[in-house]
Amino acid sequence: MNKTHLTDQKFSDFALHPLVIKAIENQGFYHCTPIQALSFPITLAGRDVAAQAQTGTGKTLAFLASVFNYLLTNAADETRQCEQPRALIMVPTRELAIQIYTDAETLSQFTSLKMGLAYGGDGYDKQLKILESGVDILIGTPGRIIDYAKQNFIHLNALQVIVLDEADRMYDLGFIKDIRWLFRRMPPAEKRLNMLFSATLSYRVRELSFEQMNHPEYIEVEPLQKIGSQIQEELFYPSNEDKMRLLQTLIEEEWPDRCIIFANTKQRCEDIWGHLVADGHRVGLLTGDVAQRKRIQILDDFSKGYLDILVATDVAARGLHIPKVTHVFNYDLPENVEDYIHRIGRTGRAGEKGYSISLACEAFASHLSTIEACTGHRIPTSEYNKEALLTDLPQPKRLQRHHRHYAGSRNQGASRKPRSPQ
């Protein structure tokens, strides 16, 4: 972590359980991020919190440390059965569930707390087998949790802690009815510790917190700065015919160590994938219809550096926590400003420098005014020389449905280097 991203307060300054502090410090973390420093005084006192915080601010550790602390310092009901988890963490996507589970495993290394996953699309029986053996902490998506609950594989009436992460996205994906169904099967709000985290504390998110929480305290982390100062934004206005060539030229010029390219539709993502693979790049494709096992493999390969570029839609990439992403390309400008903020928030994480490059073509340039109005600043604009765009590009490859969704190898002879930080 960059020191500018941290506060002067240490984890050991708070009344966290010694085993929680030991696990955190064992990972080399000693100082809190702002969201952690603000939330711990509330959650460690047993009070509810509703927090506005962007991804990359340390919010996952903020609520995981609070969950572990509560379970380690408050005994479970003596009548609790194995099908009754003590804590539930609800998230909008399976990728986010898996990432939080991985972080929780690290935090649990010195405890006897057991954890389970519940997400759709894969591993139904495997997940169920773990749940039937009994878990203290259940992490999952609303749909699969409801599935298990309706079949009485799990019961939520002994829950001591609830976390709702990315609450704003739960609305966007239509999960709120499911979430309310689950809340009705839990103990009353005053009988549990409730935590809500969201990129925005909009009216509907605050309404949900009022309904389902016990007088929550609201906190915000840098609410006036939606885009981190460490992210350098750049905007181009390409014609439709120049757009793909401009993207490929920029990639050649920037030569990013690790980048994510966002597009608004699955078809557009597949087109980009085909052009980049044909040009010799190592590329992964992440859209809504990619099978879960392939998604996990692609993300793992991208994180480990076997892939250099990830092409993704917003829904498929929501909640991803991938370190060291140097560049984000908005091939299409999103209609939703929150999607724009989420996209470019994949880079410049933990105080590191990041670059966001957007292409405002004829089809999506109309979205720019809303984005700039909501973020409160104009995106710096650059011009390109049409004559300097790459021309000797191979024909794009077509995606074979029975093949893995990535291929290619980076051209080892390329001489261009990434832009130096300014």
From Swiss-Prot:
Intervals of motif Q motif: 9-37
Catalytic activity: ATP + H2O = ADP + phosphate + H(+)
Enzyme type, top EC level: hydrolase
GO biological process, any: RNA catabolic process
InterPro entries (UniProt xref): DEAD/DEAH_box_helicase_dom, DEAD_box_RNA_helicase, Helicase_ATP-bd, Helicase_C-like, P-loop_NTPase, RNA-helicase_DEAD-box_CS, RNA_helicase_ATP-dep_RhlB, RNA_helicase_DEAD_Q_motif
UniProt GO molecular function: ATP binding; ATP hydrolysis activity; RNA binding; RNA helicase activity
The keyword Cytoplasm appears for this protein: yes
GO CC terms, sorted: cytosol
Motif DEAD box per record, residues: 165-168
Annotated Helicase ATP-binding domain residues: 40-219
Entry keywords, A to Z: ATP-binding, Cytoplasm, Helicase, Hydrolase, Nucleotide-binding, RNA-binding
Positions of region (Disordered): 394-422
Enzyme Commission code: 3.6.4.13
Compositional bias (Basic residues): 398-407
Binding of ATP, residues: A53, Q54, T55, G56, T57, G58, K59, T60
SMART domains tied to this protein: DEXDc, HELICc
Assembly: Component of the RNA degradosome, which is a multiprotein complex involved in RNA processing and mRNA degradation.
Family membership noted in the UniProt record: Belongs to the DEAD box helicase family. RhlB subfamily.
Protein name: ATP-dependent RNA helicase RhlB
Source species of the chain: Hamiltonella defensa subsp. Acyrthosiphon pisum (strain 5AT)
Phylogenetic classification of the source organism: Bacteria, Pseudomonadati, Pseudomonadota, Gammaproteobacteria, Enterobacterales
